Amino acid sequence: MAHKVILLGLDGASFKILQRFMDEGKLRNISKLASLGSMAEAIPSVPAFTPTNWATISTGANPGTHGVFTWGTHLEGEPLEENHFDEAMMPRICRAEYIWETVSRSGKKSALINYIGYPMDSNNVYHIDWLYQPDFNYFGVSPPKMYVINLKTNIKSVTRESEPGWGMDFLSTEGREKETFEEFLISDVKNSNTIATSFRIYLKHIKLQIEFNLQASVHEHFCSVKLSTSNASVELKSIGQWSEWMYIPTKAGTASTRWKLLSCNQNEVRLYRSSIFIDKLFSFPTELGSKLYKNVGPYISDEIGKLYLKGQIDRGTFLEEMKYKLDWIAKCINFLKTAEDVSLIMLHWHYIDSLQHSVPSVIY
């Protein structure tokens, strides 16, 4: 009987700290996995860069063989100034065979979750929210945000850095092809405003805008915040409450997001909005995304960690989003293993490393 393999890559995790927590009985599931499979401290490849190590893990080859030495590389015959920085984890740079290519040659399926190696040359390989596609562009159309609505002045702020932006707030994006911004449109209705989230979808040449109509009613012992689009609406009535998922049809697919009421008084309302993804734009093949939305649920990014480290979001909300993401990954793996008969699943879990990368920006 053929076995199925799941490789869990905990980016930024310390083996010594994991071992300590396992010994203290605080990581029962990790301990169980270690007892059923294998777990060992890895020796990093030289040079010890992110793309170098992920390529080594994925191929079993050393950097001298696979050719991925750092962020960017130089290919034979090209000018010295050619860097290929954005393509450091793409297969055209790697000269060794990936393990999923070997699996594909045997007629079996593989799935890569937030992993390197797209676009692949092999059949039978699924990609979900892949790392470092061309132009360094992630497939979420809008990162998570925290909003402060001043009910007295009708002024809204959108948190980004340690100081909130006012009016129109341009969101920082890594890609050169995706423009994302949010704008508050003042309504004639009392205590009603529209949050307009606009974005351009990478490689699709599609520019979209989602407008959330916001109505807030606050009294001494009662609070109601309604958010609606032309196709969906939610209402929040208690502090700490999460909304149901909002599913918003667009010409690129179905967008999804949810909201949480952080605080509410007669002066202001604070809201958190999860990241926005479109069902057909975070997986390959695209139809896999629709299946995952139906059987697993909407996908979210890891970027709330940046808001948490900057003090813009509370620890409880951060942990709730992290738990949702972990539950989603577990359900996704089970779905791929059973419904799609995937033999190899490779996961790159980035939450810990996302927090570590965010620390310098908080300090400086």
What are these regions (language model features)?
Residues G9-F15, T52-T59, F284-L292:
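Short, mixed-charge, low-aromatic patches
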Residues N62-Y364:
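His/Asp/Glu-rich, glycine-adjacent segments
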